[in-house]
From Swiss-Prot:
The record marks 175 as: Important for dimerization. It is an enzyme of class 1 (oxidoreductase). Belongs to the aerobic coproporphyrinogen-III oxidase family. The keyword Metal-binding applies. PROSITE patterns: COPROGEN_OXIDASE. The lineage of its organism: Bacteria, Pseudomonadati, Pseudomonadota, Gammaproteobacteria, Enterobacterales. Its cofactor is Mn(2+). This is Oxygen-dependent coproporphyrinogen-III oxidase. It comes from the Bacteria. Homodimer. Keywords: Cytoplasm, Heme biosynthesis, Manganese, Metal-binding, Oxidoreductase, Porphyrin biosynthesis. GO terms for cellular component: cytoplasm. It comes from Escherichia coli O17:K52:H18 (strain UMN026 / ExPEC).
Length: 299
């Protein structure tokens, strides 16, 4: 079947609705919607939940942008895109909980298509989800990765190991020599064997995110914590900011191509702290995190 951008867009809009409803049901607070238009073509729906019962901030952003020609930054690496009109659409979300025992989570699913008369369209899917704990719980990590593995299973035995490895490699802070979290799935440039197969996989990832995340939230949201845990959470959130502003391709692409800054930076934690030359106390739960987030096979 030939690529159907309209079908993908409808799925993404419905997915945004579903995820927001599921997060609101856990939190008790509602999302505020901000619809926006892009002068050069397209627009989106940004939804933010702030200072809820469970989530300090949760942002679920849908965007659909299109144009007559690709920006030079994109065609430099892919000369076959030159002279084509394009559509890019996706959902990107980040959840920052109040409780330091509840991990931060991120998910993204996206579709890109570039066309010109008389030529086959160039298209692909990308996406994934990853988890950033502040305090490590093995059962949470196993559940997260088991959910990821199980949703990949119908698409082939090699899919989960391949996309887990890609996730571990992508969410890595080179300047700190450490992982951002415990990973999950990451895929890009997916266009084989055909549109239907790739679209089905993207849908499985999009729907799988809340199955992976919400049971962990429910398990940890009522755990007692104090100033020490909160301070460590704010310190570790600094790594999230560093990754997004220094290494994340999506953030950089959005800012360099005149994307909507408020939506792009919606992933930022609302509060964060840095501390010069900080080292957690030996043997403390905080010190255990650096070992916990090292790459390993969780399932």
């Amino acid at each position: 079947m030939k690529p159907d951008a309209h079908q993908v867009k409808q799925f993404l809009l419905n997915l945004q609705d579903t995820i927001c409803q599921q997060l609101s049901a856990v939190d008790g607070a509602e999302f505020v919607e901000d619809s926006w238009q892009r002068e050069a073509g397209g627009g989106g729906r940004s939804r933010v939940l702030r200072n809820g019962g469970v989530f300090e901030q949760a942002g679920v952003n849908f965007s659909h942008v299109h144009g007559e020609a690709m920006p030079a930054s994109a065609t430099a690496h892919r000369p076959e895109l030159a002279g084509r009109s394009f559509e890019a659409m996706g959902i990107s979300l980040v959840v920052h909980p109040h409780n330091p025992y509840v991990p931060t989570s991120h998910a993204n699913v996206r579709f890109f298509i570039a066309e010109k008369p008389g030529a086959e369209p160039v298209w692909w899917f990308g996406g994934g989800f990853d988890l950033t704990p502040f305090y490590g719980f093995e059962e949470d990590a196993i559940h997260w990765h088991r959910t990821a593995r199980d949703l990949c299973q119908p698409f082939g035995e090699d899919v989960y190991p391949r996309y887990k490895k890609w996730c571990d490699e992508y969410f890595y802070l080179k300047h700190r020599n450490e992982q951002r979290g415990i990973g999950g799935l990451f895929f890009d440039d997916l266009n084989t064997p055909d549109f239907d197969h790739c679209f089905a996989f993207m849908q499985a990832v999009g729907k799988g995110y809340t199955n992976a995340y919400l049971p962990i939230v429910e398990r940890r949201k009522a755990m007692a914590y104090g100033e020490r845990e909160r301070n460590f959470q704010l310190y570790r959130r600094g790594r999230y900011v560093e990754f997004n502003l220094v290494w994340d391709r999506g953030t950089l692409f959005g800012l360099q191509t005149g994307g909507r800054t408020e939506s792009i930076l919606m992933s930022m934690p609302p509060l964060v702290r840095w501390e010069y030359d900080y080292h957690p106390e030996d043997g403390s739960p905080e010190a255990a995190l650096s070992e916990f987030i090292k790459v390993r096979d969780w399932v």
